[in-house]
Amino acid sequence: MAQTDNHLVIMAGGVGGRFWPMSTADCPKQFIDVLGVGRSLIQLTYDRFAGVVPSDNVWVVTNQKYVSLVHEQLPEIPLNHILSEPCRRNTAPCIAYVSWRIKKENPKANIVVSPSDHIVTNEAEFKRVISNCLKFTAETDAVVTLGMKPTRPETGYGYIQADLSTASARNREIYRVDQFREKPDLPTAEQYIKQNNFFWNAGIFIWSASTIVNAFRIYQPSIARIFERIMDVLDTADEQRVIDEVYPECENISVDYAIMEKAEEIFVCPADFGWSDLGTWGSLLAQTQHDIYGNTVIGKDVHLFDSKNCIVHTTEERKVVIQGLDGYIVAEQDGKLLICRLSEEQRLKQFTGEG
């Protein structure tokens, strides 16, 4: 497998409403320096594939309104690799579009699909796992998804049940998927944790271009027909005009329902590289450094007194003083201020009306 055949697809069309006020419809969280490290989440996603996928083989699928943001933050990737969705249709049409596009450019392409807003703390292990999976999919017709080894009974993630009794003959770290499970209630999640064959579904996929295109032809023929019909205009001056016309015809469906739960050659690679989907303020608190009282502070002039288990995030050069809070989010961005119990953050979209 030549590294020049490796391609990365970054899905970057989401709004991230659960991270209000930092993340808004005008500038979602993937374009923000959430961790205070000088790089946005989409830039960190791009960075962690260095040495695995050449920059010329990186693709981003995003909403039309974010194309300029992607180009501004990732100037290294070809401009014609930033694909613009005219409307939101979930992950299956997004992946189909870019897969047909990549296959037209390189029929031998091997593809990793990654969300734009996850974080990884052990990048060396991440690269090892991804490279291992790419080698496997280059040699087989398999569809591989990464399964994160759970560290707690999490109810916010879907789970993958693996058959650990038999590893693939080609790769001893990759196993067949028994079943995909929906987000569980707490008692069910606690049962999953007691077993060693349940993994968090990270939404990271690895497959060859020919494998995923064939899977769409078999399991989602209506979506496949749309992109087969427009193959001749892909990578031409007419591409965006035609995509704007036909993309709304695609069914609004996730790749999990469209392909993963139907296909036969589905494998999971259990992994442990410090992963978080960073979907909530609570997940950010769990992934960042705390003071001795369990507080996380991202900001230049923040002072806490008699407070614990709080996350404070400010991007403005303002003095922030907090006293007597336990388990709160305090976040400020562009004149908007959030003060909310961490235990109530699932209601943020309800509170703000955004996302």
Language model segments and positions:
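Conserved N-terminal catalytic core of the sugar/cofactor nucleotidyltransferase
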Residues: 1-10, 18-25, 36-115, 121-131
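Left-handed beta-helix
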Residues: 2-5, 209-355
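Short beta-strand segments
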Residues: 10-12, 61, 112-115, 145-149, ...
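Residue-level signal for inorganic ion chemistry
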Residues: 42, 98, 117, 160, ...
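General beta-strand structural signal in soluble alpha/beta enzymes
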Residues: 60, 83-84, 113, 144-148, ...
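Conserved core of the sugar-phosphate nucleotidyltransferase
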Residues: 123-237, 241-243, 267, 317, ...
